[in-house]
């Protein structure tokens, strides 16, 4: 029986843990699969995705900066992908790509089940308004947060995200210059890629954003999350959480869409954390 082909598309994508995660899921469930990382720029993504389909690709994950492009290329969309305006999971069906977004479900599952946070009634600051932010915002609203403030370097994108969410009573956008005037938040989510250049100054955020309950969450993991989490710890946030748990949970959601079974994420998450600890101690 031929092995089904899957991939993660991004730019850059060599650092992605998704191939290792899905390999572990396959072993756990007894499903044979070939999952690779494919680097594609925005300009090359459409052609690269078509080549992948022509070569028998059955499904794909999509990461930065391609999530909104994947949304545009999908022939059909799930409700959560349509609401997000971004796609992180593609399923090949009858010669067409179906788009979904598992980011929000992955984040909420990690925060509520693994980290033990109660999101109900919480005030949330969302940094960023691109594909990553769009993917998680609807799920945070569904989880029962009381208010969300979206801040982005481009205020037009923040406004567009707020309009798309369609909940003006709960969701507002503010200028980045207004951060000192926003009060405090129980949840601060970094959905930007500002940490990629490892500039600690990228997150010189006002300490007034933090209260005694604040959880600071970076949707990135590894080196890209270092700067934001360093700020969170210096600001004495109660929790400083990277995106590794979300990554594993959204991957499990994607795996279930492709294969009809949801794998156990705990052993995969634990193995990745252990590997991370070994890498840090080896530095």
Curated annotation (Swiss-Prot):
Binding site for NADP(+): 79, 128-132, 243
Pfam families reported for this sequence: SDH_C, Shikimate_DH, Shikimate_dh_N
GO CC entries: cytosol
Enzyme Commission code(s) on record: 1.1.1.25
One MF term in the entry's GO annotations: NADP binding
Keywords: Amino-acid biosynthesis, Aromatic amino acid biosynthesis, NADP, Oxidoreductase
Active site per database record: 67 (proton acceptor)
Residues annotated for shikimate binding in this entry: 16-18, 63, 88, 103
Domain of life: Bacteria
InterPro entries: Aminoacid_DH-like_N_sf, NAD(P)-bd_dom_sf, SDH_C, Shikimate_DH, Shikimate_DH-bd_N, Shikimate_DH_fam, Shikm_DH/Glu-tRNA_Rdtase
Catalytic activity: shikimate + NADP(+) = 3-dehydroshikimate + NADPH + H(+)
UniProt pathway annotation: Metabolic intermediate biosynthesis; chorismate biosynthesis; chorismate from D-erythrose 4-phosphate and phosphoenolpyruvate: step 4/7
Family: Belongs to the shikimate dehydrogenase family.
UniProt protein name: Shikimate dehydrogenase (NADP(+))
Species annotation: Xanthomonas axonopodis pv. citri (strain 306)
Organism lineage: Bacteria, Pseudomonadati, Pseudomonadota, Gammaproteobacteria, Lysobacterales
């Amino acid at each position: 029986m031929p092995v089904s082909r899957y991939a993660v598309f991004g730019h850059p994508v060599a650092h992605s843990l998704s191939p290792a995660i899905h390999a572990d899921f396959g072993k756990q469930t007894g499903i044979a699969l070939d999952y690779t990382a494919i680097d594609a720029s925005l300009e090359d993504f459409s052609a690269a995705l078509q080549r992948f389909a022509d070569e028998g690709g059955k499904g794909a994950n999509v990461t930065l900066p391609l999530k909104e492009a994947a949304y545009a290329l999908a022939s059909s969309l799930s409700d959560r992908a349509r609401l997000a305006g971004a796609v992180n999971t593609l399923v090949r069906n009858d010669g067409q790509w179906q788009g979904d977004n598992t980011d929000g479900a992955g984040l909420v599952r990690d925060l509520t089940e693994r980290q033990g946070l109660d999101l109900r009634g919480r005030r949330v600051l969302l940094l960023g308004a691109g594909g990553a932010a769009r993917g998680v915002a609807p799920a945070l609203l569904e989880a029962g947060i009381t208010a969300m403030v979206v801040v982005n370097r481009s205020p037009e994108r923040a406004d567009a995200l707020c309009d798309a969410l369609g909940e003006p009573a709960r969701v507002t956008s503010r200028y980045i210059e207004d951060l000192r005037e926003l009060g405090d938040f129980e949840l601060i989510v970094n959905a930007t890629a500002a940490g990629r250049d490892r500039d600690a100054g990228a997150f010189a955020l006002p300490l007034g954003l933090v209260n005694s309950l604040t959880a600071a969450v970076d949707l990135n993991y590894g080196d890209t999350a270092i700067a934001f989490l360093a700020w969170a710890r210096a600001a004495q946030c109660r929790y400083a959480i990277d995106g590794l748990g979300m990554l594993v949970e959204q991957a499990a959601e994607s795996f279930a869409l492709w294969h009809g079974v949801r794998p156990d994420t705990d052993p995969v998450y634990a193995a990745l954390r252990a590997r991370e600890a070994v890498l840090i101690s080896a530095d």
